[in-house]
């Protein structure tokens, strides 16, 4: 398996051990935990996490827990910043195919890196991004 990019919901479901996460997605996260691959977290996922906390849709301390996981440094989870190259990739993703801006940024990150996306968003293959789900 190659490295991958994660969508926000997949990351949340993995860290919460939520059964909504597919077996294939769970296996990729477990490979990351074993140090076999890297999973990139687009920084917009952090924005979505704060938003979901504010809406009380996830634990109010989820972002702090994620920060602790990332700070330890023994994980294959790596933040990937929103760069001008990601913005250029975003411009190539049709708004009609992926109308939600955070989803477009996540898709653009995967496209820029040339990696599959861990997501259940079935619109992504329409723009040429392979899914792991």
Label the predicted regions.
Residues 1-41, 57-68, 113:
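Short, well-structured N-terminal submotif of metal-dependent ribonuclease cores
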Residues 5, 40-43, 81, 118:
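Short aromatic/basic micro-patch
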Residues 10, 45, 86, 106, ...:
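Alpha-helix capping/helix-boundary segments
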Residues 19, 43, 84, 121-122:
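Alpha-helix N-cap/helix-start capping motif
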Residues 49:
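Phosphate/NTP-binding elements of NTP-utilizing enzymes
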Residues 74-120:
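Active-site neighborhoods of divalent-metal-dependent phosphate/nucleic-acid chemistry enzymes
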Residues 128-133:
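Active-site regions of enzymes building and remodeling cell-envelope glycoconjugates
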């Amino acid at each position: 398996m190659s490295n991958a990019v994660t969508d926000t919901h997949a990351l949340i479901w993995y860290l919460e051990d939520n059964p909504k996460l597919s077996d294939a997605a769970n296996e990729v996260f477990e490979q990351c935990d074993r140090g076999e691959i890297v999973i990139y977290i687009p920084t917009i996922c952090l924005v979505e996490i704060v938003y979901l906390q504010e809406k009380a849709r996830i634990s109010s301390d989820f972002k702090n827990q994620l920060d602790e996981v990332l700070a330890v440094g023994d994980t294959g989870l790596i933040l990937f910043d929103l760069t001008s190259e990601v913005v250029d990739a975003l411009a190539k993703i049709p708004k009609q195919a992926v109308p939600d801006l955070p989803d477009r940024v996540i898709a653009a990150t995967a496209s820029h890196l040339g990696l599959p996306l861990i997501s259940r968003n079935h619109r992504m293959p329409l723009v040429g991004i392979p899914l792991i789900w």
